[in-house]
Curated annotation (Swiss-Prot):
Pfam families for this protein: Cwf_Cwc_15 (PF04889)
Coiled-coil annotated spans: 123-165
The UniProt record lists the keyword Phosphoprotein: yes
Name the record gives this protein: Spliceosome-associated protein CWC15 homolog
Biased composition (Basic and acidic residues): 52-84
Primary location recorded for the protein, binned into one broad class: nucleus
Biological processes, Gene Ontology terms: mRNA splicing, via spliceosome
N-acetylthreonine: residues bearing it: 2
Amino acid sequence: MTTAARPTFEPARGGRGKGEGDLSQLSKQYSSRDLPSHTKIKYRQTTQDAPEEVRNRDFRRELEERERAAARDKNRDRPTREHTTSSSVSKKPRLDQIPAANLDADDPLTDEEDEDFEEESDDDDTAALLAELEKIKKERAEEQARKEQEQKAEEERIRMENILSGNPLLNLTGPSQPQANFKVKRRWDDDVVFKNCAKGIDDQKKDKRFVNDTLRSEFHKKFMEKYIK
């Protein structure tokens, strides 16, 4: 049963605990991670390539020993391979041991002919692959040249269209088409309120007057007449 609910007859008082004789002194608390952990230097052991040990080693002798061990392992595996090869060769029937009834003109008589035939077939395959590769390269080069030519023709067409459409003297239409309109269009801000305010009153027309009110200005009236009414 818990004793958390029981009353405390002796409550804790400041300055009565351990190390709390002076209340003006701040309490200090340290964590285990704040304490120094590595207080001793670790040295290399005899098998960890210490400098003295490296100086005393004879690397050349160790290398020669490893090479001799590798040669011994290689020679140990060689008799087994030679025995396997000799047994496989001995299994092949000799030409003089084959009866005459089993001989056929289509059957290969020696392994050299088989090797020559395989080499010729390999050469033929290589030549065919090289020819196919050259064909593919040629087709790709032709396709690239065709695309470049089409791109140049398109760029030339666009350039000529820009030249003809940009020059009004060369852009004259025929008799069947409507005549070109060379009239200069007015700007959208020709009739705004605060345009050319720095000019004198004499430069302006007599029938126009300045009104510092956007609702009673001529521009607002024209706008309402044109778009609202």
